[in-house]
């Protein structure tokens, strides 16, 4: 029996966050087929009347590809240079792919100091609302080329999972779909344990969940799940919802919006 997540059926304004692992192949090359498929699916949603915002990672990964480098440099200035180079190429790829489906896109690069304060926060909020009204799909990334935290001036979001949640909060999104390298949240690492079970729904971010998703000594042990729980917590505090799912199956986004039980659904109890 196919179950339906009925509350998702009401979603009209949707934020999709895609991570570097879904954009860059294991050999360091750009995953062109994934970007093309993403452009098709989001353009199709826009044609159907949904308001869509894309939060993307990948600037440094694409920068490495552009320069033919296979190792991320340790120096902050070198990483910023790569982000600057990669962001141009990344947006060029997105523009080309979306153009195939007659969809216009825009770019917005954010830093934490802009979204943390009510006065400055109004600017990206107003810009995003205006872009959506123009039938544009905004593409958002952190401004990695300039974002560096100092003692009294925080400019970095920390990761783009958090950025996806903050953007969802900013635009009062009905749903955040987070594309990852895993099918959802499991009770233990499914790449190691054959009996790992996926959580269909999560209603609260507990200390037990955080410990399970935490560092190298945890049962889970895969990087990035802690940041996804932190993003979910931001959404819970705003009475918003998120689905965590696999970025290798981008076409499932449509089924998720239709309420199909795919991935892990984070929402407060109805």
UniProtKB/Swiss-Prot annotation:
GO terms for biological process: L-proline biosynthetic process. Catalyzes the transfer of a phosphate group to glutamate to form L-glutamate 5-phosphate. Its EC number is 2.7.2.11. It catalyses: L-glutamate + ATP = L-glutamyl 5-phosphate + ADP. NCBIfam families: proB (TIGR01027). Pathway: Amino-acid biosynthesis; L-proline biosynthesis; L-glutamate 5-semialdehyde from L-glutamate: step 1/2. The lineage of its organism: Bacteria, Bacillati, Bacillota, Bacilli, Lactobacillales. ATP binds at residues 17, 180-181, 222-228. Its main location: cytoplasm. Pfam families: AA_kinase. It is found in: Cytoplasm. Keywords: Amino-acid biosynthesis, ATP-binding, Cytoplasm, Kinase, Nucleotide-binding, Proline biosynthesis, Transferase. One of its GO terms (molecular function) is glutamate 5-kinase activity. One of its GO terms (cellular component) is cytosol. Belongs to the glutamate 5-kinase family. CDD domains: AAK_G5K_ProB. Substrate binds at residues 57, 144, 160. This is Glutamate 5-kinase.
């Amino acid at each position: 029996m196919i179950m339906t997540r009925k509350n998702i059926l009401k979603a009209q304004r949707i934020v999709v966050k895609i991570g570097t692992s879904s954009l860059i192949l294991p050999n360091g090359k750009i995953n062109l087929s994934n970007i093309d498929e993403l452009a098709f699916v989001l353009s199709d949603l826009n044609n159907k009347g949904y308001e869509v915002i894309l939060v993307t990672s990948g600037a440094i990964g694409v920068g490495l590809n552009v320069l033919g480098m296979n190792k991320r440099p340790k120096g902050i200035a070198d990483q910023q240079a790569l982000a600057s180079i990669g962001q141009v190429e990344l947006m060029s790829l997105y523009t080309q792919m979306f153009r195939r489906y007659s969809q216009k896109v825009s770019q917005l690069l954010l830093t934490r100091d802009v979204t943390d304060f009510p006065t400055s926060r109004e600017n990206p909020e107003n810009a995003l609302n205006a872009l959506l009204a123009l039938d544009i799909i905004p593409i958002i990334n952190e401004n990695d080329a300039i974002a560096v935290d100092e003692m009294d001036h925080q400019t970095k979001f920390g990761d783009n999972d958090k950025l996806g949640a903050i953007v969802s909060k900013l635009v009062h999104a009905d749903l955040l779909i987070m594309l990852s390298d895993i099918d959802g949240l499991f009770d233990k690492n499914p790449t190691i344990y054959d009996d790992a079970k996926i959580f269909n729904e999560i209603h609260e971010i507990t200390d037990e969940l955080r410990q399970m998703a935490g560092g190298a000594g945890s049962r889970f042990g895969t990087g990035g799940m802690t940041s996804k729980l932190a993003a979910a917590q931001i959404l819970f505090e705003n009475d918003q919802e998120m689905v965590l799912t696999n970025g290798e199956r981008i076409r499932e986004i449509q089924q998720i919006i239709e309420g199909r039980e795919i991935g892990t659904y984070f929402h407060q109890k109805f």
